[in-house]
């Protein structure tokens, strides 16, 4: 019995040591996965497009009171049919704990926050803006300072995951801002994200990280179009290219996600060509400002510009493959 007790004591010691070590490791990381909270908030979501609609519906599904805003009245009506709410901006601002901006760019973000009918002047002190658009880090810092003048908190919080993850409330967020901003936004973050990377206590790093992601994503999509059409030019079936390369070292998430769109001849815009003119433009502007050469990003941007010039700007970004196909005199698969 003494031996058994001794063995139990040793095992207990090691279990405690492992638990303590694990807790220290978790405390040291700045990546937080979603934990559902019971706190319910009033949330205003601006931009009910492919991403914003999913964000708004995820917040609604979590039990929050959600106002939806979009220049497209049909999108607002669609959200109302899901159980969302609509109000005048001043009214929504006065009662909102959180404002989530999921609009296209920095100009739209600035307008919905501080324009003629901007919402920030109507928000209560201590409420928070979660700004999800891809913008330059300098603009993120400027918007945070303007919010601070109204005693409104600001999270520089670009998102990734596409419309599917948005609808599932499982986005990845690259966020930076004060501890108070994170705390004020937490119930909303629990509803719309799977993982939140906390990248600093001021605005800017979140947008800088998103620029890194967009550089890679844009280059990978352009590379997908080039590789797939190159294979077709050599007489290889497009579907077989996707099947084989997806299991090889040369694959990428973007190849596996976008190449099937080309194989199916389906260019329904989940993420449009025009998005990349903006996002890679931001990447190159930021790079230029820091005297950093980004030739791959520049080359990818030229392909997206060419696609837009061919009238493909509103199509899915996989349509960049059409630029390569046209130059090579190839015919891509047609929609089934």
Model feature map: region roles:
Residues 31-102, 127, 195:
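NAD(P)+-binding Rossmann beta1-loop-alpha1 motif at the extreme N-terminus of oxidoreductases
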Residues 90-102, 106-152:
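Rossmann-fold NAD(P) dinucleotide-binding segment
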Residues 134-214, 218:
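Rossmann-fold dinucleotide-binding core
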Residues 168-176, 197, 203-234, 243-257, ...:
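Active-site-proximal catalytic alpha-helix in oxidoreductases
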Residues 207, 216, 251-316, 336:
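Interdomain hinge/lid region at the active-site interface
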